[in-house]
């Protein structure tokens, strides 16, 4: 099935020519009246105009959030939970509309938005609706007349900055725990993908009290900087590049507020020789696990962009992988058969191509792809790159630097010790993949790899209730787990004496 382009006959969605900031429960124009035009990666054509917001717009959103904070924080857990469940239902009821919107905004294949991004977004709201209902404080008996009560309280007003690679899903990852915990939010989307959150707000805005959720569009150096440096937020959460994340952490330190940052990665995907003695279905699964590096066009922080294959199985296993690569269907992202879509922006498109040049200069062997994906018709102006496999070594820049595109560096190893050394030879530690039928090896390697998540005999699963976050320069904090509620709460200790007698010091 091929979905009609938005705004054309038969389309499931039509966009407005101009959107505002969402502040205090309504869309409003930017204070200075400035806008920027966003284009679709699918065809390089304009989508709509969005506010080029400034510090004044951030302050306006913070005014609305602070005005709503006390009432929302006092809203019962049951009511907050029910609102999150209604948000999940509304998302699910508008699956196709949101999936097509996300594809048009980001360029990713609609098969992914239909089956991953949007369903997972709904599920995360449901998950945290359940978590907040189940969360308990504690009471500790200090002695026979003194009790320590520990109570969860919301932080108040928090800032969130989301990336362009999974705009709606990353919004759900951050909004669900923050709202569940009783916080009001000022959120800034990436300027490359401002559309999806606007369409979502049109669908769910009536479910939340005005001021609880506010969205300010604009550029990172203007609106994002103003939000991150504001003295009126109690926490900042960010997903994006490591250099920007480092700056966010400095801003948080200056304001003495907590921060959660999910940053870059250069994830190893390790294949041991015993997989080739497994069932044919498992061998195919393992090959797919390597090709999953092209999921979302490689624009994933945990992209398994370093494939480590044991020497003894390299020829046979890579033939299975190349069969999968040759079978990848490229083309119109609105076609449900398309597996790899467009890169999210021209800037990212050019960055990836520059790394393909670097790989050639470094002497990497080209196994597949390596160039622009030339499409015809309306897609000719889109940002398409061939899924690319490069054979090389871990010292190359294409193995060490985050490319954030459909580019995988493949290398070999002799034994377990060498595999672990190569895997950990990176400044990042967000994710890793591990493929073996030896359960003891799986445990040893899983514990030895310095990464926040180690997929074992699988890859790119992102269920709620599986903690997600990085080691080293891949970030601070964890998401997609009930522990995230603690990140959006303060702990109040009530230390109560039930003894009528004085202490006796004075």
UniProtKB/Swiss-Prot annotation:
Reactions listed under catalytic activity: acetaldehyde + NAD(+) + H2O = acetate + NADH + 2 H(+)
CDD domains, A to Z: ALDH_ACDHII_AcoD-like (cd07559)
Top-level division of the source organism's lineage: Bacteria
Record-linked InterPro entries: Ald_DH/histidinol_DH, Ald_DH_C, Ald_DH_CS_CYS, Ald_DH_CS_GLU, Ald_DH_N, Aldehyde_DH_dom
NAD as UniProt keyword: yes
Active site: 262, 301
EC number: 1.2.1.-
A single MF term (Gene Ontology): acetaldehyde dehydrogenase (NAD+) activity
Induction pattern: Induced by growth on ethanol.
Pathway in which the depicted protein is active: Alcohol metabolism; ethanol degradation; acetate from ethanol: step 2/2
One Pfam family from the record: Aldedh
Gene Ontology annotations of biological process type: ethanol catabolic process
Keyword list, A-Z: NAD, Oxidoreductase
Role noted for this protein: Catalyzes the NAD(+)-dependent oxidation of acetaldehyde to acetate. Is likely a component of the ethanol oxidation system that allows P.aeruginosa to grow on ethanol as the sole carbon and energy source.
Family: Belongs to the aldehyde dehydrogenase family.
Protein name stated in the entry: Acetaldehyde dehydrogenase
The organism's taxonomic lineage, starting at the top: Bacteria, Pseudomonadati, Pseudomonadota, Gammaproteobacteria, Pseudomonadales
